[in-house]
Amino acid sequence: MSQLTAEELDSQKCASEGLTSVLTSITMKFNFLFITTVILLSYCFTWLAIRALWKNNIFSNSTRLILIACLLNSVVHQTTMLESRMRQTYRSFVFASEPCNLLYRSSDCVFELHSYYLTGYFSTYSVCSLAFDRLVSHYKSKFYHTHQYFIAVSLLVLQLLLTLVSFYIAYYGVHLAGYVPVCIHYPRLAVHYSTVNTVRTVVMVCCLVVTGFIYYLSVKSEKQIQKSSYSPGKRYTAYENVTTSQSVCILIVLKLFCNMLSSIGINLLLLMGEVVSEGTFVLVALFLPGVTYANLCLPLVIYFKTKLIIRNRKFRIAVMTSMYGDAGEHIDRLKKSWE
């Protein structure tokens, strides 16, 4: 799609025949039902995940605070997506035969633009907070455990700053000219939109590498502690570092996959330019809301990982008590086996 001036975009009030066909199609209505289902599921599991973090927390307090902030942010993002899609679907029924009333003027979508993209960027950069949280936990363990809330708040502030900088680069000063099929559609004159998407993907890859390395070190450290230390506190801390790092790795992998699905897909469509019609671009783009999918994956991982770890803990305790009696006797047996 070629770059047009603001005046040319403002003159295109009516949807083209192809775009009208797409916006009123059965495929678009199926897309609405599919995305709505994803969002409603994310609401349910977000509630379950917050309850798990509050009542059966398996993470450090720092990690838990970051995850709760991400879950609350996801609710705002999903609600913005749902509201925009409901309005678009309503218009597709009411104005199906009036192409000049199908589209939204970009300047009328300021609230959705800010809400959708700010929460989307905040969700993406949560991987930075989680990665640095694991980094500090491993290399500055004593400081980490005595200043967890300070670390979490500091990382969330950094996450917010990255969000604001990305939004500033992508949209500050961009003229909200022309008309868009959905209010969450990026402004047509936002020339740095794809660049910011690429940077977000690179940042996520770097954070995945860092977290994967920390996970490897945590596993290695736990094995050494299990062999050399009899302190329940040290063993427990090492085990918690491994499980937390593993969970964060899973979260980042899923977020990266969802983000790449969206950013790479959109960037490819932008690069193809005139080869892709406006209707096809809109249809494909609405099937690729990566952050929306990631906002479902986040509570799913938290909830089911919590259930799994609690079950494993109960199983280990049952095995230890049934095989060796009390803890003191078990430690004596371990000492003899390690001599």
Curated annotation (Swiss-Prot):
It comes from Caenorhabditis elegans. The keyword Transmembrane helix applies. The chain crosses the membrane at residues 30-50, 150-170, 199-219, 250-270, 282-302. Belongs to the nematode receptor-like protein sra family. The keyword Transmembrane helix applies. Keywords: Membrane, Transmembrane, Transmembrane helix. Signal peptide: none annotated. Pfam families: 7TM_GPCR_Sra. It comes from the Eukaryota. This is Serpentine receptor class alpha-21. One of its GO terms (biological process) is sensory perception of chemical stimulus. InterPro entries: 7TM_GPCR_serpentine_rcpt_Sra (IPR000344). It is found in: Membrane. One of its GO terms (molecular function) is G protein-coupled receptor activity. Its main location: membrane. GO terms for cellular component: membrane. It is a multi-pass membrane protein.
